[in-house]
Amino acid sequence: MTVKTTVSSKDIDEAYLQLKDIVKETPLQKDHYLSQKYDCKVYLKREDLQWVRSFKLRGAYNAIIALDEADRQNGITCASAGNHAQGVAYTASKLNLNAVIFMPVTTPLQKINQVKFFGGDNTEVVLTGDTFDDCLKEALVYTEENKMNFIDPFNNIYTIAGQGTLAKEILEQSKDNDIQFDYLFAAIGGGGLISGVGTYFKTHSPETSIIGVEPAGAASMYTSVVLENQLVTLPDIDKFVDGASVARVGQITFDISKDIVDDYIQVHEGAVCSTILDMYSKQAIIAEPAGALSIAALDQYQAEIKGKTVVCVVSGGNNDINRMKEIEERSLLFEEMKHYFILNFPQRPGALREFVNEVLGPKDDITKFEYLKKSSQNTGTVIIGIQLNNHKDLGHLKANVDEFDKSNIYINENKMLYSLLI
């Protein structure tokens, strides 16, 4: 028996019929703020408004319903950093199936709780491993030992076809309003979304350029397709964009992406954070890091999209409110607005006032001041955080700090110190 390893637009049409009464047809909205900002027409496909607040329900349900009834009754498993897990849990509850869901221990608490909420009594959550890839190994061993069915988050043709149904929605919604897209931007984690959406667009809207967007610290598809021309595993990844931080993409998604993705963009995690804050403050859109990737990529394509029509897939909105402080911190660091130093600071009254007057600009602010070590001498070791009013003042700030203490250490340029102290 030949195992099918690719996906066609017909497969996506069939998945669409399967999912029609299960998933929500999410809005395709023109974004006036982004359109004005980039001097083009920007539309957002709002998968953050899906039942489980991400597109992953589409692929999960389609892959599970494709199993034989007997296989489904044996139970299902999955490995996921959150959104695929919610899709599997939702489906397990809907179809009254037993599900065991493996999630990395680094998964935001909000996503873990949502999986339990959607799955109810049908779902057991197992936290294991620091990354998705570590978690995946455990899930596969458990699945084989217990003769259950593993629902792959991306390397599965039914998962990919399910994700592709949002492309069918986009094109039907745009046809109703006579819209033709020049560019489509979508996030890449394991590659299921870009493979499904890209496949459908290449068949029904071949003039649209497909742009895949990855976190700079986890660009596994770009590395595999563009740099190495073979499937590779990244030795280390930045896990912050948890919904798209995958060390190794799927063989199926790799093969499809090679043919249908026109360009790959890597976005710095700090830029993702700035986009999250911008979308929330300007438009009250709550995007998770992976959900903000497609919009964050527009900065790098500003010249190309000017005067064009663009659609960005907002792939998810499962953002843990407890992460907002970290998101703001990463954004300020990326925008070069926040800076940390270790200084020898005078231990006498009035020293801090002198520092403010001599080192800071009139609108700069001290956000952190902490003695690392006090001594009986005239000075103590201090860590100080400074937020600038204008990032262009950094050179002036550094010069003033050097004059205050020539032996100072600039922590922003030392990742090890930053991770230990901030």
Curated annotation (Swiss-Prot):
Catalytic activity reported: L-threonine = 2-oxobutanoate + NH4(+)
Positions annotated to bind pyridoxal 5'-phosphate: 83, 189-193, 315
Pfam families: PALP, Thr_dehydrat_C
Cofactor(s) listed: pyridoxal 5'-phosphate
Biological process, per Gene Ontology: isoleucine biosynthetic process; L-serine catabolic process; threonine catabolic process; threonine metabolic process
Functional pathway: Amino-acid biosynthesis; L-isoleucine biosynthesis; 2-oxobutanoate from L-threonine: step 1/1
Single GO MF annotation: threonine deaminase activity
InterPro entries in alphabetical order: ACT-like_dom_sf, IlvA, Ser/Thr_Dehydratase, Ser/Thr_deHydtase_PyrdxlP-BS, TD_ACT-like, TrpB-like_PALP, TrpB-like_PALP_sf
Main EC class the enzyme belongs to: lyase
Keyword Amino-acid biosynthesis annotated: yes
Residues with PTM N6-(pyridoxal phosphate)lysine: 56
Keywords, comma-separated and alphabetical: Amino-acid biosynthesis, Branched-chain amino acid biosynthesis, Isoleucine biosynthesis, Lyase, Pyridoxal phosphate
Domain of life: Bacteria
Keyword set includes Lyase: yes
Domain ACT-like residues, every copy: 339-413
Protein EC: 4.3.1.19
Family membership noted in the UniProt record: Belongs to the serine/threonine dehydratase family.
Function: Catalyzes the anaerobic formation of alpha-ketobutyrate and ammonia from threonine in a two-step reaction. The first step involved a dehydration of threonine and a production of enamine intermediates (aminocrotonate), which tautomerizes to its imine form (iminobutyrate). Both intermediates are unstable and short-lived. The second step is the nonenzymatic hydrolysis of the enamine/imine intermediates to form 2-ketobutyrate and free ammonia. In the low water environment of the cell, the second step is accelerated by RidA.
Subunit structure, as described in the record: Homotetramer.
Official protein name in the record: L-threonine dehydratase biosynthetic IlvA
Native source organism of the sequence: Staphylococcus saprophyticus subsp. saprophyticus (strain ATCC 15305 / DSM 20229 / NCIMB 8711 / NCTC 7292 / S-41)
